[in-house]
């Protein structure tokens, strides 16, 4: 703990000794509440004072002091639990010696109150205190509600303070919990089985991403933190589980911006005997369920944009590009022609780029940011979809879709490739891509190929980013504001030379 104290912190430290003189433990013990502040507000807020005069409601609550006013023999406190606050009225003649504890308390202290409910002349629901129990001394003053913690980075680093003083943040994380609960309820109700698969993986697969690498001492081997849950979940489909899903953390050792964080949460789900169409229907149904459950509406506002989940649009990737640029990539163009088109449109072509990669970059540059309403983009090039089935009508493309909302990707799904011979060829091509400089290419996963060799039924699968769903439904523009503890460079760690 930093030994340099402010004047206020020094005074608070002195009060520890004052509490001990009053035979009060500064950091308290257990305290059993009869109600939460939320219970009291929701159940008694709209009741008149006349009712309280005829019906005495005794309460025993605990909370953090966020306001203190009054002098002499009476005063008021505002106590706050996570999301609700209530006024407390305290008088020396009712509290006796406990009134000294009230007089010595500071903002931020955690206390218990025993008393009964009444309404003030201004009709504010209030507890008249009969006992004041000190529970925890706060050794640092709370940030000023209006002037403190204005720096966004500081709020993210000290989320505990942000939650104390910022109602918006509290609502975001309550909503996040509701969203995850609604996702779980949806898939449970659809007959999916929730499973858990390893975070540490011996091989890299299931997505195109740079991994975090760690060492397993007991096995004397390097492992990856998973970049997706796809391959182990599909092994469970091979094993006979017809519908599975997993909600969990994914790790990708890549850049950070307003919509990307290296550690993030996803839901992945796989259904035997389904396909791309089944996944589209499941995705739309799931998002509509989440919106209705959490917001009670299919219409939302996100960053001054009105978005409706009533209907979902659908367009192929090549048609979307043609609409914006006039270029028809559905036609079979030569690599030289594609490279020339990329040059004409100021698209940087990397050494490993195939036609499929060029098509993807055209989409990202000219189409993606314009997809505001929920839109399924389907028909991705084969080269960028190593785990998806080829489209039967045009094998240059796959039965894959991504869902875009507000200009960002939210869902990735496809008819899963279940041909082990074709999958091995795709993995070999990924290795060639890696040799050409694609550090996000998949590795060869022999155990997954072995599983496919026993036969995986035709399967549909989807992956959805939970953090982005939370951003969307809470009207939050930065992913770091929907993650409780985002990462920061630790300036206190001294690196070994």
Swiss-Prot record:
| Location relative to the cell | Cytoplasm
Q: Which Gene3D superfamilies match?
A: Bira Bifunctional Protein, Domain 2, Nucleic acid-binding proteins
A Gene Ontology biological process in which this protein takes part is: lysyl-tRNA aminoacylation
Q: What is its EC number?
A: 6.1.1.6
Q: Which GO terms describe its molecular function?
A: ATP binding; lysine-tRNA ligase activity; magnesium ion binding; tRNA binding
Please tell me which top-level EC class this enzyme sits in. Answer: ligase
Which chemical reaction does it catalyze? tRNA(Lys) + L-lysine + ATP = L-lysyl-tRNA(Lys) + AMP + diphosphate
| Positions that bind Mg(2+) 1 | 402, 409
Stored InterPro entries: Aa-tRNA-synt_II, aa-tRNA-synth_II, aa-tRNA-synth_II/BPL/LPL, Lys-tRNA-ligase_II, Lys-tRNA-ligase_II_N, Lys-tRNA-synth_II_C, NA-bd_OB-fold, NA-bd_OB_tRNA
Gene Ontology CC: cytosol
The protein's required cofactor(s) are namely: Mg(2+)
Q: Which residues bind Mg(2+) 2?
A: 409
Q: Give one Pfam family.
A: tRNA_anti-codon
Report the superkingdom from the record: Bacteria
Which NCBIfam families does this UniProt record tie to the protein? Answer: lysS_bact, PRK00484.1
Quaternary structure, per UniProt, is: Homodimer.
What is stated as this protein's family in its record?
Belongs to the class-II aminoacyl-tRNA synthetase family.
Task: State what protein this is by name.
Answer: Lysine--tRNA ligase
Species source reads: Phytoplasma australiense
Starting at the broadest rank, the lineage of the source organism is:
Bacteria, Bacillati, Mycoplasmatota, Mollicutes, Acholeplasmatales
């Amino acid at each position: 703990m930093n030994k340099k104290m402010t004047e206020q912190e020094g005074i608070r430290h002195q009060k520890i000794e004052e509490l001990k003189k009053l035979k009060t433990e500064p950091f308290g013990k257990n305290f059993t509440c009869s109600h939460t502040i939320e219970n009291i507000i929701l159940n008694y807020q709209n009741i008149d004072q006349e009712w309280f005069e005829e019906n005495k409601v005794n309460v025993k609550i605990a909370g953090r002091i966020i306001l203190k006013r009054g002098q002499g023999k009476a005063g008021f406190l505002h106590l706050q639990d996570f999301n609700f606050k209530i006024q407390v009225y305290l008088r020396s003649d009712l509290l006796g010696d406990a009134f000294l504890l009230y007089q010595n308390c500071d903002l931020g202290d955690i206390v218990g109150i025993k008393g009964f409910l009444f309404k003030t002349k201004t009709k504010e629901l209030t507890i008249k205190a009969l006992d004041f129990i000190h529970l925890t001394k706060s050794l640092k003053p709370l940030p000023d509600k209006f002037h403190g913690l204005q720096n966004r980075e500081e709020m993210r680093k000290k989320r505990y303070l942000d939650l104390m003083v910022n109602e918006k943040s509290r609502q975001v994380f309550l909503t996040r919990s509701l969203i995850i609960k609604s996702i779980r309820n949806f898939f449970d109700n659809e007959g999916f089985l929730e499973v858990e698969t390893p975070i540490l993986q011996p091989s890299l697969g299931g997505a195109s991403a740079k991994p975090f690498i760690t060492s397993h001492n007991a096995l004397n081997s390097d492992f990856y933190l998973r970049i997706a849950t796809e391959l182990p979940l599909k092994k469970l489909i091979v094993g006979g589980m017809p519908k599975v899903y997993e909600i969990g953390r994914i790790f990708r050792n890549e850049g950070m911006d307003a919509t990307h964080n290296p550690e993030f949460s996803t839901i992945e789900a796989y259904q035997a005997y389904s396909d791309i169409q089944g996944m589209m229907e499941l995705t739309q149904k799931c998002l509509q369920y989440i919106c209705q459950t959490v917001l009670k509406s299919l219409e939302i506002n996100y960053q001054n944009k009105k978005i409706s989940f009533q209907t979902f649009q659908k367009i192929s990737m090549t048609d979307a590009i043609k609409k914006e640029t006039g270029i028809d990539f559905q036609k079979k163009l030569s690599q030289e022609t594609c490279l020339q088109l990329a040059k004409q449109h100021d698209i940087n072509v990397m050494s490993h780029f195939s036609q499929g990669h060029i098509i993807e970059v055209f989409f990202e540059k000219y189409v993606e940011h314009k997809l505001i309403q929920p839109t399924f983009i389907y028909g991705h090039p084969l080269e960028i979809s190593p785990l998806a089935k080829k489209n039967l009508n045009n094998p240059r493309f796959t039965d894959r879709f991504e869902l875009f909302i507000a200009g960002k990707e939210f869902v990735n799904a496809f008819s899963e490739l279940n041909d082990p011979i074709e999958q091995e060829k795709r993995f070999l091509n990924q290795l060639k891509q890696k040799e050409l400089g694609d550090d996000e290419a998949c590795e060869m996963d022999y155990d997954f190929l072995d599983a496919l060799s026993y036969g995986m039924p035709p399967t549909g699968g989807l992956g959805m980013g939970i953090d982005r769903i939370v951003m969307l439904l809470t009207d939050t523009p930065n992913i770091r504001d929907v993650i409780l503890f985002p990462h920061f460079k630790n300036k206190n760690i001294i690196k070994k030379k």
